Amino acid sequence: MMLIPSMYINLIDFFSLNAAEVGLIFGIVSFCFGVGSLPMSFLYNKYGPKKLIVFSQLGILFSALLVSVSSSVLMFSLSSILLGLFASIHHPVSLTLISETFDKNIAKANAFHGVFGSIGVSLGPLISYFSLLYFSWHYAFIFTAILNAFLLPLSMKFIPNTEKMDIIN
């Protein structure tokens, strides 16, 4: 989610937009990121955490690839909105998973989640920086897709369904 603000100027130039238009696109994407979290409690109970997180990562992977090949404002906007919606799955699902999985060490588990979340937030602008420095804005989204392709098998292997398993002792 932090890729777009880091590349406002490049997006303005590439799509011949002004700052307000890019801000509007990011605002809509951010809104979708927030609102997309709402149905997750129902979907969590129906499908479980592993399926939802894998679905989220697959969606982020393909949406990021769509953003990376965007040649029009419409395609960029719609694929970014999809990216925001798929990304919105993570927080409600992972926090619920933590609360169901850990008994004694829930605070420690949430702390680890927060640390890695902060790393993720700081990686967005860093990925943008190196992409813009050495390639183009498109590559920031390609790298995001690659990262999700790398994380996907790890999620499939290590995310439990919902059994209690306090593993951070």
For every predicted segment, state its role.
Residues 2, 30-38, 121-122:
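Residue-level signature of mid-helix packing/kink "hotspots" within the transmembrane helices
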Residues 63, 74-82:
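Paired small-residue
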Residues 35-71:
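Conserved MFS/SLC helix-loop-helix module at the cytosolic interface between two early adjacent transmembrane helices
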Residues 156-169:
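Flexible cytoplasmic inter-helical loops of multi-pass small-molecule transporters
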Residues 80-117:
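Cytoplasmic helix-loop-helix junction between adjacent transmembrane helices
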Residues 112-159:
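Helix-loop-helix hairpin linking two adjacent transmembrane segments in secondary transporters
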Residues 16, 48, 69-74, 103:
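Helix-breaking motifs and short loop linkers at transmembrane-helix boundaries and internal kinks
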Residues 1-19:
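Extracytoplasmic
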